[in-house]
């Protein structure tokens, strides 16, 4: 069922008055760095791993409200959702979903320890108050430990970009009775960075179930804080914090719940991370303490089910810079995770050798050992190469293995099996990038396999749950990513991304993973004060999950999105955004609705 809503009354919205191409990809230049590919910050051209970088300006001007939907403009990234904003949404990297993709916000691991798969739910996360995003692809357990089998998504909150005190305020309103307000404040001195953001989002939504009639609304408040102070020339300290309080209505499979349609999740999540950095000659050190807690209550037809998860972590990271052709990174960490029934702990140690034998060649070798309280030790490794064959041509290659330990829920005999062993993975990619004047072209081949994969089988009767059990099997994904950016002229920029993914689970097509995924974006600077972005997404050949009803709309679809910005003054920008311009009727998860045409307008004021 398709839901169409017209643009509501004008308010205020986020959008800088410069052209932001809809398919977001950092323009290639020597100053661009990745902070997650290696343990130390690395120039993007010197990284052998495949990384997508989305600048803060493009995140803040995202043409989609849900951040997970916006990320699908990147090659290799897809998503599915069980309804409107606030309902469960999974982001996949090269066919692997949330359970295999740790999500970090300001260094805090925000994956839910109490969720059945252990992943992060993108359902209620918008771009409000967020900044730069990095997506690291392939098995990365040698860098990030367990679960980093498909890759890692690293999100930064608001950051100061200039000295002094600055801020912005924005509100946005539109279809589906959507309302959002955002406040951001930043301060920078010679030694201190400080940023705070707060957002409030409310929407009436639409029926999550394709067979339902009542709207499923969503409301959330989110706050982020970042602080760093350079105490002396060799010592720095800081902290980051986040708080999320949300209420999201949802539908079970098959339709609305029993009257009064009271199916909803109430979630409160808090995160805190403190760190100290010390430089002692050629060796740098960082010690960090972090805590994340998710307290969720799922109410379905009058029955409340609590889910509470906590994660506590201590990190030490060190780096020895010889000043020559090689440097050595090393570290250790201790993590505790618990839900209402169980508790585990993990001790990890790692080392990473970076070698630059010539000015055009960079090699990275990483090894990590994780000692899990429920299993034997797991050793992970990674090797990566970046070769600048010519000044305008870069060849990248990487091979890595990884592991994912069963979650607390999967070890629970009611749903799973306490004898489950960790999943193991192998992945590699090979890519080439051609620099252009004001753009680039990139092609990457990739492959990932997982042995002993744990998945949920709704037809299994092995456990006492009565509605399915976790089982084990195998997974393979192979494919090709193509992407590029071309500056047509001084006023027009074209972005494109195409991904072919052939993913199999236990010898059958993996569900909800498109075989073909295309995104095209055109950014236009129409006048000095007016810019617009036009985006087209086409998805083809998708297999619905076994839970989808016989009548579903999972398959091929094409979406058009438009957003435009008008700079009223140097400090005030008016904004218009239209999602699904031609009102496509489609589903990304069988039996669950997606939005029809939806329009939003607003204004953003900087000070």
List PLM regions with ranges.
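Periplasmic-side early beta-strands and strand-to-turn transitions of outer-membrane beta-barrels
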Residues: 141-142, 154-156, 160-164, 168-172, ...
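Outer-membrane beta-barrel signature, preferentially recognizing the C-terminal barrel domain
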Residues: 256-275, 279, 307-310, 342, ...
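Extracytoplasmic beta-strand/coil segments of soluble accessory domains associated
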Residues: 36, 68, 72-109
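N-terminal periplasmic accessory domains that precede
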Residues: 67-70, 89-92, 101-104, 120-125, ...
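Short acidic/polar hinge/loop motifs at secondary-structure boundaries
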Residues: 109-137
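N-terminal Sec signal peptide and the immediately downstream disordered periplasmic leader
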Residues: 1-74, 186-187, 233, 486
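Conserved C-terminal beta-signal and adjacent last beta-strands/turns
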Residues: 5-7, 186, 230, 511-607
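Gram-negative outer-membrane beta-barrel transporters
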Residues: 356-360, 447, 470-545, 573, ...
């Amino acid at each position: 069922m398709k839901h169409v809503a017209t643009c509501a009354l004008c308010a205020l919205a986020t959008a800088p008055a410069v052209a932001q191409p809809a398919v977001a990809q950092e323009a290639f230049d020597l100053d661009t760095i990745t902070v997650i590919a290696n343990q130390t910050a690395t120039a993007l051209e010197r990284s052998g791993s495949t990384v997508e970088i989305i600048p803060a300006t493009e995140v803040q001007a995202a043409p989609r409200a849900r951040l997970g939907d916006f990320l699908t403009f990147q090659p290799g990234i897809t998503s599915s959702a069980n309804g409107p904003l606030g309902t469960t949404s999974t982001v996949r990297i090269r066919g692997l979903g949330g359970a295999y993709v740790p999500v970090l916000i300001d260094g805090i691991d925000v994956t839910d320890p109490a969720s059945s798969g252990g992943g992060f739910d993108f359902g209620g996360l918008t771009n409000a108050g967020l900044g730069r995003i990095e997506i690291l692809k392939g098995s990365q357990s040698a860098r990030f430990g367990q679960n980093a089998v498909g890759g890692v998504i690293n999100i930064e909150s608001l950051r100061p970009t200039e000295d002094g005190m600055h801020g912005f305020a924005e509100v946005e309103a539109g279809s589906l009775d959507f309302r959002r307000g955002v406040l951001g404040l930043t301060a920078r001195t010679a030694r201190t960075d400080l940023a705070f953001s707060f957002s409030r989002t409310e929407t009436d939504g639409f029926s999550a179930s394709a067979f339902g009639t009542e709207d499923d609304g969503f409301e959330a408040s989110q706050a982020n804080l970042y602080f760093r102070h350079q105490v002396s020339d060799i010592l720095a300290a800081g902290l980051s914090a986040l708080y999320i309080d949300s209420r999201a209505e949802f539908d079970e499979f098959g339709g609305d719940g029993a009257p009064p349609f009271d199916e909803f999740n109430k979630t409160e999540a808090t995160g805190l991370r403190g760190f100290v950095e010390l430089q002692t000659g050629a060796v740098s050190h960082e010690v960090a303490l972090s805590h994340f807690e998710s307290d969720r209550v799922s109410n379905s037809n009058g029955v409340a089910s609590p889910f509470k998860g906590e994660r506590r972590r201590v990190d030490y990271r060190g780096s020895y810079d010889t000043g020559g052709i090689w440097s050595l990174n090393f570290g250790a960490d201790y993590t505790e995770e618990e839900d209402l029934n169980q508790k585990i702990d993990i001790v990890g140690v790692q080392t990473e050798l970076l070698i630059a034998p010539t000015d055009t060649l960079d090699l990275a070798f990483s090894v990590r050992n994780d000692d899990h309280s429920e299993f034997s030790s797991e050793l992970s490794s990674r090797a990566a190469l970046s070769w600048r064959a010519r000044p305008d041509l870069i060849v990248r290659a990487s091979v890595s293995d990884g592991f994912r330990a069963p979650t607390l829920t999967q070890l629970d005999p009611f749903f799973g099996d306490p004898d489950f062993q960790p999943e193991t993975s192998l992945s590699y990619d090979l890519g080439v990038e051609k620099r252009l004047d004001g753009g680039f072209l990139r092609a990457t081949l990739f492959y990932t396999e997982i042995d002993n994969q744990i998945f949920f089988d709704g037809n299994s009767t092995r456990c006492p749950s009565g509605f399915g059990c976790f089982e084990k099997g195998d997974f393979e994904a192979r494919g090709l990513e193509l992407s590029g950016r071309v500056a047509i002229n001084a006023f027009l920029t074209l972005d494109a991304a195409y991904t072919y993914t052939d993913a199999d689970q236990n010898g059958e097509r993996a569900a909800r993973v498109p075989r073909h995924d295309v995104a095209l974006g055109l950014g236009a600077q129409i006048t000095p004060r007016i810019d617009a972005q036009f985006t087209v997404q086409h998805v083809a050949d998708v297999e619905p999950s076994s839970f989808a009803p016989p009548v579903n709309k999972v398959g091929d679809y094409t979406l058009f999105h438009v957003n435009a910005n008008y700079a009223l003054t140097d400090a005030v920008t008016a904004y218009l955004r239209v999602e699904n311009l031609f009102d496509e009727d489609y589903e990304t998860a069988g039996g669950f609705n997606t939005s029809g045409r939806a329009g939003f307008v607003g204004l953003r004021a900087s000070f």
